[in-house]
């Protein structure tokens, strides 16, 4: 599918250079160093395995926050140990998802956003790393919608209450955070972690 649909284009402008690749890296795309969050990540990956949500051929979306990235690393190690392969990953992609693809633990990456330079390189070089429009991926009226095909969706939140309502808009002090990422499509999915 096209990355930008024609009905969203007013004009096309030719430029000498498109963007500054070295500024693509986001501050959120670093694995957490917090021992507590690393433990949460490890326990989450173990839960995915023990519950049967993680299996050979499963599909996964992993967020770009520090704990989400750590979960993806633990999942990658499990996949290698078991000889399993994810059917596809949906991104925002990072170097951790690219590593799964390049090492054979993921068949494809369907990518709506590249979060770091490894992901940018992979989209350019790897035929199994496929740009995928958010107009299709997140639109539950679209035949290209991915949310109902996802087995595992891992995203960060600042707060979760006892009824599993997630806050991704503010810190607990009420100050606005940043973009909400993939939450809007994940809420339509079968499994959200």
Residue spans of the language-model regions?
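Active-site histidine-anchored catalytic micro-motif
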Residues: 91
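Conserved phosphate- and dinucleotide-binding cores of soluble alpha/beta proteins
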Residues: 1-59, 70-79, 84-87, 96-193
């Amino acid at each position: 599918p096209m990355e930008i649909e024609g009905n969203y284009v007013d004009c096309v402008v030719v430029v000498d250079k498109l963007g500054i690749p070295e500024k693509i890296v986001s501050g959120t795309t670093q694995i957490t160093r917090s021992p507590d969050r690393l433990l949460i990540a490890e326990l989450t990956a173990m839960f995915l395995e023990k519950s049967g949500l993680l299996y050979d051929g499963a599909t996964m979306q992993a967020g770009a926050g520090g704990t989400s990235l750590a979960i993806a690393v633990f999942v990658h190690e499990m996949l290698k140990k078991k000889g399993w392969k994810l059917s596809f990953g949906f991104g925002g992609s990072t170097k951790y998802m690219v590593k799964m693809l390049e090492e054979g633990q993921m068949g494809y990456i369907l990518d709506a956003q590249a979060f770091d330079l490894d992901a940018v390189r992979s989209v350019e070089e790897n035929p199994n790393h496929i740009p995928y429009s958010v107009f299709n991926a997140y639109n539950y009226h679209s035949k290209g919608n991915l949310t109902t095909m996802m087995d595992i969706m891992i995203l960060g939140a600042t707060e979760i209450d006892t009824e599993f309502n997630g806050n991704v808009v503010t810190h607990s002090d009420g100050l606005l955070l940043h973009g909400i990422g993939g939450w809007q499509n994940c809420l339509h999915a079968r499994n959200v972690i």
